[in-house]
Structures are given as structure tokens and as C-alpha cells.
Amino acid sequence: MHVTVQLSLLLSLASSLPLVSAIPQHDGQAYTFPSTGRSATADTDPVLEVRQGAYRPPSAWTRLRDSIVESVWGVPQRGKDSETKTGKQSEAASKAPATLQARYGEDVVLRFTIKTQEEMKALVEASNILFLDVWGTHDDGIPSLLGLLPPSLQTSHVPLIRDLAQAIYESYPKNNPSSPSHPGATTRRFSPSASTPESQPHETKNIFFQDYQPLSVLLPWMRLLVSMFSSHTTLISVGTTAEGRDIPALRVGVHPTNNAQQAPRRRTIVISGGAHAREWISVSTVSYIAYSFITGYGKSRSITKLLEQFDYVFIPTVNPDGYVYTFSTDRLWRKNRQSTSLSFCPGIDLDRSWGFEWDGNATRSNPCSESYAGEGPFEAIEAREIADWARKEVTENNVHFAGFVDLHSYSQQILYPYGHSCAHLPANLENLEELGAGLAKAIRRSSREIYDTKAACRGIVASGAREKGTNEPVASYALESTAGSALDWFYHDLDVRFSYQIKLRDRGSYGFLLPREHIVPTGKEIYHAVVAMGKFLVSPHILEEEVDEPHAGEQTQDNSYDEDGDNLFRAQGGDPQVRFTRRNIGAHDDDSE
């Protein structure tokens, strides 16, 4: 049977300069697309309720946008009746404040099914012209059913959100955050007493992970951890942001007594998040793993052994300025807050600004682009500061970086180098694939969630066809460049042989607006992956020992562990235990890549 690949693009049709937005709607929910008046999930064409806030006459920008999209995709013009009914029905539903309605009220999120390279090129071109934001892609192998369907279904687009402003409103912390959804609220402060069982008898032990936390809460929480666990935890700064904030990090490790004049070369693993400001789940996940390691020392045999072998540097957000901005102004902001050549388009993409294989030519003339890489390598201040810190650790502090994990969202992928080109192969490709598969298995055993493992260059590429016999892609469509990434720089320039970028939950149902209920489950599954990585770097045989549960929340739902967590690397159904065999890794050789 011939198999094709279904490619879905998530993008925001924004009515102003670049807004980022995307959440797929749940199955069975119908939405009336503003340009057509048609329901995307119904068999007929009823006019259904549209939850977009109060109806506003379309602006000139909106009319221009719609006409271009209609010309590209052949969408029929909507009639007056459908527009009137849509407006009337959209008045009542949204509970989002006026500030969010004003910013996001006209935005819609669509999923397009791409079948040809020409359609892909047309959509990418239209997205660039209209400053639309592509959230991501996903591909599924399906039978060649499209040829049996009428053209209207073959070219249909599926709305993925009915009320973006409401979805953003619901994503903010419940307890009086300093956000545009609570314009009168003051900045929250972290209160240690608020997290005790006595004051919150019906909550889990650590209330910190029951919601997304702003920087004003995150920093005091980090200081509190250091004061409580000073024997193996220190608070450091790995740089300064464009707006003058420190980039805080927690260094966790147990240093044995050494009488030598020079300390032994210390192996270090870096876990970072928050490079893209809107990806809140990455900030919470780094914090969760840090808390689990800090509180697990002396209680968990796995954690105790790892902290005796490695220093872990946890950087919850490498983009504090952007993170603060997502709480105060724009929930879907992606870049940092650095000034550019256009005063009304600030910000540089921190994961496109690193020095290795930097390629900003595609966005050099457009600072408004969400992927703007700056005028040159390391123009983004935060990327330059972290790179300088890492180099100094190697040259002055006798540090050897053994691993690097950069957390992002979303799509549930474990990506290894290289991102800039699939033609450039890493020297230890087999080892990267082997450990990547082990991380995915650790996640699957802890939560039953599936994470795909692939090269970073294929994380944003979709294929339209497969070669017979080899199942290799015949044609690939790159949605955006991933040159200049932290992943590639740490691997190549800093020689961190085990570098990964992990894209966290989910696969598109919520996108960047992942509900707070996913914070603890996501943290737990990535905690298990980080533990597995540490054990692999120590010795493959250590993977056979226990992996204890983290100490940062309630127990996992599937209860698939014994008391010591021995089952981490056992396949379901009693299959033999998975064993890693790390092969010899030769010296770094650019010619072999």
C-alpha cells in the first residue's frame, strides 16, 4: 500500500505585526473559520458558535490578509449571512480581559494538510509576507485515502482554536500573577510558609510546581533551595541579559575532599530551558529536575552517586527578559528583548544566534521575524554571555562539559546534532542515537509518553513521499533554518560529545499553552531521562541499578516502579533488560563529519 506523509502546519493568522499563537482544538469541537463561514469538523455547513470575543468589523489589514490567503488556497468568499451570524455568536463566549481581547481577539489558528511541494512553498511565502508564525509540524503515515475524497476535503484546513485570548488567559498562574490578564495585580512574592502541608492540607507537598511561576517567584525559590541545601547547592550567574538582569543557575554537586594543589577536572552536565520565552514548560521542567536532584541527595542512591560524579548546572531560563515579558505583556513572545535596527521590532532568537554555522542571511533584513538571528553571530547578548561563561569554565575552572540538554517545546522529540544541515554528520553519531533511544525509553517507562529520536535537522522537516524499499524521504520541505543553535555550538565548538535538544510535551493539542496540570508529569519524565543520561556517562553498567522516584510531587500514575525504581530499563511484559554499550569515541575530526 502506498503511504504518504501528512504534514500539518500550525500558524496564527494575526491581525498585527508578528504575533505568535497556536493551539489545536480537541476532536469533535467545531469552529467557524472567519474567511469561509464553514465548519471544519461537521459534515454539513451549519453556522456554529465562534468564541472569539466581541465582534469587530474586519480591519484593512485583515481584509488584505484574507484575500491573499483565499487566493493562495482557493477559499470561497464568505457571504454576508455567515459573517453576521459569526459576529453575533462570538460576542458572548470569551471571559478573557479586554487587554487580551485587544491583542489576540482577531487571531485564529489553522492546520493545513500539505500534499505537494508547491503548496508548501505557497504557504511559506504567504506566511512570510503576512508575518504569520509557524508553530510546528507533525507527520503521520496514512493510507493513500485522499484520492478517494472530494477536492473540498483534500484541500480543507482545520481550525485548531476557537478563542485564543481565552486560552492565553487560562494559561496564566491562578494566584494573582503580574500579567495582562490581571492588570491590577501586584507582583507575587514567594512565601515558603505557603508550601507547607499545614497551610495547604489538600495540596501536594510542593505547591511551587502546581502552576507556572514568574521570575519574581522563581528567583526567591532558587535562593531558598540554596539556603536549605548549601552543602551541595550554589546559586551562580552565567551572564547578564540585554536589560541588565542576571541569568541565574543552580550548580549542584558533591565535591570530595582533595588535598592536591589543583582540583581534579570536574565533569559537568548543563540542563537549560527558556531560550524561547513563551515555552514556559521548559522553565518549569528545569526547575523540577533541579529540585529533584537537590532534595534527592542522600535519599536516592541514583542521585547521590550522580552528584558525586558530576556537577549539574541547571539554568531554568536563559532568556529572563523575554520570560518576564510573557507574564507582563505578551504571553506568546519568543525572542529576547534586545533592541534591533527597527525600534518597533525588538528581539533576537536566542537559538539562532550562536556562532557555529550561524546563518542569519534569511532574516537579516527582517528584524520582525520570529526567527531573526541578528546581524552577526552572537549578537544576542544572552547567547554571547553564556558562551563566554562556558569557555571560562573550561579554561580557568578546569571544567569538562560531559553533557548538554536544552529543553524546548513542543512536539515530544529528542534531537541530536546537527541542526544546521543533515549533510553534516556528528563523529559519534552511533553513540548519540544509542543514548537518545535510551532517553526515550526512560521517558516511556516513566509516563508511557512517546518521544521521537532524530537529528535536529529533521526536527523541522517533513517529507511528502517515501522511496520504495528504503522508506527514505524523496522530497523534504524545511520550514525554517536551525543554524546557529545552542545544540550545535555546544557539540562542535565546546566539544560536548553528548548534546541534545529535547522538545517537551505535547504533540500539538495545546502547543505553547500547555496546561499547568502537565508540569509535574513532564518534569518527572524528563527527570528520568536526565538520570539515565548521567548513568550512561558514568558507565553502561550503572543503568542496571535503581532509579528512584523524584521528590518534587505526587507519585507517577502508572505505578510501574518498585520501591527503588528498578524497572526503569525493563521493557513492559518482562522483556529482557535493555543494556547500553557505549562504543569508543574517537577524537573530534571535522573531516569525518
UniProtKB/Swiss-Prot annotation:
Main localization, broad class: other
Q: What Pfam families does this protein map onto?
A: Peptidase_M14
Q: Which interval of the chain is the signal sequence? A: 1-22
Which positions correspond to the propeptide?
23-175
Give residues annotated as binding Zn(2+): H276, E279, H408
Kindly list the GO molecular function terms attached to this UniProt entry.
zinc ion binding
Q: Where in the cell is it found?
A: Vacuole; Secreted
Cofactor field:
Zn(2+)
Cofactor notes: Binds 1 zinc ion per subunit.
Task: Write the protein's name.
Answer: Inactive metallocarboxypeptidase ECM14
* Species the sequence originates in: Arthroderma otae (strain ATCC MYA-4605 / CBS 113480) (Microsporum canis)
User: Highest lineage ranks of the organism?
Assistant: Eukaryota, Fungi, Dikarya, Ascomycota, Pezizomycotina
